[in-house]
């Protein structure tokens, strides 16, 4: 009976050790993948097109604002036949950013009151 109990404890210990090693390997792979994605995003962010600049060469190159990415909007100017594309922020996203900023500011005040 003691042998079975000792063997069971040894088996559980080895199983937990092997699964912990496996999870560490997965965590390391996830971290490496995340770091490479962050590096790619930073490299791409340096090449973005600022707001109200021409984005007709690459419609997905608009810069990010505080919360949202600007959108390449194309239109025909009055009296013109050429299409013009510029990076712009849609109004609903502009209002959402303002509301988030005010909520953040109010949250800071509440934290001061009760913190």
Swiss-Prot record:
It is found in: Secreted. Residues 21-44 form a propeptide. It comes from Lycosa singoriensis (Wolf spider). Keywords: Disulfide bond, Knottin, Secreted, Signal, Toxin. Disulfide bonds join 48-63, 55-72, 62-87, 74-85. Residues 1-20 form the signal peptide. Belongs to the neurotoxin 19 (CSTX) family. 01 subfamily. Pfam families: Toxin_35. This is U3-lycotoxin-Ls1q. The keyword Secreted applies.
